Amino acid sequence: MLKHSENSMMTAVMDYAVIVARLYEKALTLGSLTLNTADEYVMRYESDYCFIDQYYRLANETYFGIDPTCELFDAVQKVKRCLDQNYSKLCNRINMEWTRCLKETGGIGEVHLLRQQNFYDERIKPIQKKVAVIVSDALRYEVAKELIGELARSKHIASLKPAIAMLPSETKYCKPSLLPHRELKLYGKGEEQDMAVDDHILDTTLKRSEHLQVYRDGAVCVPFETVAEYNLEKNREIFKHPLVYIFHDVIDKTGHDGNAKQIVNSCRDASTELKKMIPKIHASYNVTEVYITSDHGFLFNDIMFTDKDKHKIEEDCLERSTRYYLTKSKDEVNGVVKFPLNEVSGMVNVSDVMVAVPMGTNRFAAPSGGYMFTHGGAALQELIIPVITSRQERDDNKQPVGVMILDRRLSMQASRLRFKMLQTEAVSMDMKERPIRVALYHNDVPVTPVKDILLDKTDPSLDNRKIQVDLTLNKNIDAKVLQLKVFDATDELNPIIKENVTNNTLIENDFDF
């Protein structure tokens, strides 16, 4: 039997096993994957499907932290190979049904979400006070879901809503559409296409700033790195502007050329950077509203794609990639779904152009390559993008999370008490973290070291909010009953928990010849 705390590598193996088990547990409770409407798929993606993606990413992140010299590594590799295949098959099945539903029920127009190209008009334009927008390239919805849990520990209030990206779910089309515009147009450049915003290609930060200022006087666009590297004084100059668009590129920049380890680590890096930056923008630069969104999501599978796994494109096309191609052909193609580009993109000069995407999560054979990490298609993971709204508000009304002892009979053995506590609520936008102090007492004097514990878990699962506590006597005590006391760290006069503990150490000593 492995002890979780004895060996860091064994700990990593056990953590990996737990995450894999959670993924399979979630997968087994999904029920039928055949739903009636596109909106139902979006709701299921928010509530269930996105956690499959999250657990797969976290499983990979944990796997790459396991030392290959670990004695259980061969067994872990076998589990991973099975997981990679099973996850790939499940994602494909979900998205086969999703794309079938889109095809049969009227396309993306039947999805009742904020359309990406309307983001500025519907979310930013009505705001008259100072606002910042962070556009994080390839920030997938499930990564944002994890981020919102981290932001719950901050004093500001944040909420997460889904929106739907344009097709193709590609940076050069989706990112500029988040800026204000009168019209979007497809702009041909040989065998590649681009998108003009009000007849301009906005492919640099300077061009985006100049364009933004046409719609809001004094607005500015800056790279995330600039804000991260600047000192307080320089950043205060940036955030004097009424509207600041910040472009953040960690996941996409790493993903296209990275290996599996680099891809999952880039998600962690992006989340960490955003988690630090958002409260800083609120607190240091007096910006009351910050929006965080993405140009698109991505598909990620740590498997080899052979030629037989790649769908060959046999039609004439304007542009092609691993997850889409643009064509003027309206002919039906086996394994491919086509949408009128003007209905799924917001572009106005493309009435004769179709965007073709593979059913499910299949990949097209394309000279651009990039199969492990890819986007451009119509999978839920690519199209459903996050819109996080963070507002600077006082958290005086937030209640601290609760705590309870799970063990019914507390007894001390060999001078040690081991028991489990439960953080009764998850830290959220309604509940704040709680620092507590725990010790054993006799006559109101601590007889073990006082243990400081921060109840800050954001996981909705009760099992993942359990905490094991060990207390060891540091004084000779002849009392048969001691008291376990738990205090809120801000009030050490009134315990929130007080339980009797049988001192079996004394009984053992009575028979110690």
What is the meaning of each model-derived region?
Residues 1-513:
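Feature captures the catalytic ectodomains and active-site-proximal regions of enzymes
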